[in-house]
């Protein structure tokens, strides 16, 4: 029953994106980031119960199958146009499979503060990918908004993080390089998805996501079978695994991935990546609300810079015609 309600909620959110109300779309962007920020804790729980690659593969395959079921119920076309086959395979390998594998391996050797800082560069990599793939122009005003976002990140990490700044290590080792690579590949994947949505209008974003998730999930499970111990499967706590995977599939794969993909039809990947910088701030809120952690003192300042940067980028992209009020 909970899963059915969540799926109905996801469909409602995705429908609202294309109503001619930009305020509602902006609200959905930040609501999506708010929901997505819970996936870190859920992923940690899942990895406590099973091997990381098996977790990734299981959730991707399960989510893809559920999406295919929803599309069949809605009687949407699942036929892949020939020009879309290779881009979807590329999206599956780069945007889903490699991104998740590199992220999981890199996070095992990094502190949360360093990981958050590296993820803070995603709007810059998204802007570069948009320039290369979609020929979207990066203006000085947009760079100013991105810089404000970076300032907000520095304020949050220096004055609002949960770890002592003195404990930070700034050496560039293998974990840092893996996470930087995951950030770049993720930005490339979202830009490729936006490009696919433009060129293959006969195929819905949900269908593209379904194909990409199943392909990436199968690759992850094959990788897991080669590198992780299956006896008979790499799961130590079946109940916790099922609970965590179920929550991840519903909140991350079904709601957030698909809503983000829908939003890419109306907004650039640069703007959406910038808005997703608030995810660590929302994670701090969850920590304060659910775990009783102290409220970070730099949080309000970071949010203030984030709002200013968001307005700059939004108005500039609206002027450039990259923001659509309706489809």
Swiss-Prot record:
Record localization: Cell membrane
Domain of life: Bacteria
Major subcellular site: membrane
A Pfam family annotated for this UniProt entry: EamA
Domain EamA span(s) in chain numbering: 34-157, 189-313
Keyword Transport: yes
Sequence intervals crossing the membrane: 22-42, 53-73, 85-105, 114-134, 143-163, 165-185, 202-222, 240-260, 271-291, 294-314
Keywords, alphabetical: Cell membrane, Membrane, Repeat, Transmembrane, Transmembrane helix, Transport
Membrane topology: Multi-pass membrane protein
Biological role stated in the UniProt entry: Transports S-adenosylmethionine (SAM) and S-adenosylhomocysteine (SAH). Allows bacteria to acquire SAM from the eukaryotic host cell and to likely remove the toxic by-product SAH.
Protein name as annotated: S-adenosylmethionine/S-adenosylhomocysteine transporter
Species in which this protein is naturally found: Chlamydia trachomatis serovar D (strain ATCC VR-885 / DSM 19411 / UW-3/Cx)
